[in-house]
Amino acid sequence: MARHGGAYVIAAVGSASRGDGLAALGADEVVVGLKGVGGPVDVVLDTVGGAHLVAAWGLLAPGGVLHSIGWASGEPAVFPVNSTFAPGASRTLRSFGDTTAPAADLALLVDLVAQGALRAPIGWRGSWRHLGGAIEALRERRVPGKVLLDLDRL
C-alpha cells in the first residue's frame, strides 16, 4: 500500500528467506535487520517491538513517525537516556489501537485487491477450529504471508 501511495519502501526482515517475494509486492529494497537501512526514514511500521523498536526510533528523520503495530519479540523497549530528544521537528511514536469504524478503510482495501494493486499472499489457510495451530505457526514464524481462517458450521 505504501508503494501504491508513492512511497519508497524498505522491507526489513529477520532472515533472507523471509524476504522472498517482497519485491514483487512492492518493496524497493529488502534488507535483513535494521542495520541495512541507510536512514533517515520518514515512517516506520514496527511489528517486532523491544530492541527493534528502539533501533527503528533511531532511524527516524526529523518529523518522522514510528508506528508500533505489534510486539512479536515479547521484550520491553528500553530507550537510552535522552535518546528521544533531538533537534528539529519532533519525531512521533504511535501505537496500534485505533478503534474507529473500519468500513471505509476496508472498502478501500477491497477495491485495491479487486484492481490488482494490492496482494495479500495467504501462507496458511484452514478452519477456524484450528485457530490454535494457526497462532502457533504465526508465533514460530512458519507462515510467510497471511493466515486465512474459514468459518464453517458446527
Regions found by a protein language model. Name each.
Residues 12-17, 33-34, 47, 70, ...:
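N-terminal Rossmann-fold cofactor-binding loop
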Residues 117-121, 133-154:
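C-terminal capping/lid region of NAD(P)-dependent oxidoreductase domains
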Residues 1-33:
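Mid-domain Rossmann-like dinucleotide-binding core that forms the NAD(H)/NADP(H) cofactor-binding site
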Residues 44-45, 67:
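N-terminal Rossmann-like NAD(P) cofactor-binding module of classical short-chain dehydrogenase/reductase
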Residues 51-118, 151-154:
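Glycine-rich phosphate-binding loop and adjacent beta-alpha segment
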Residues 19, 53-54, 132:
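Short, well-ordered alpha-helical microsegments
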Residues 37-44:
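A short acidic, Gly/Pro-enriched loop at the edge of an enzyme's catalytic core
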Residues 29-33, 125-130:
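Short acidic-hydrophobic, aromatic-tinged amphipathic segments that line or gate anion-handling sites
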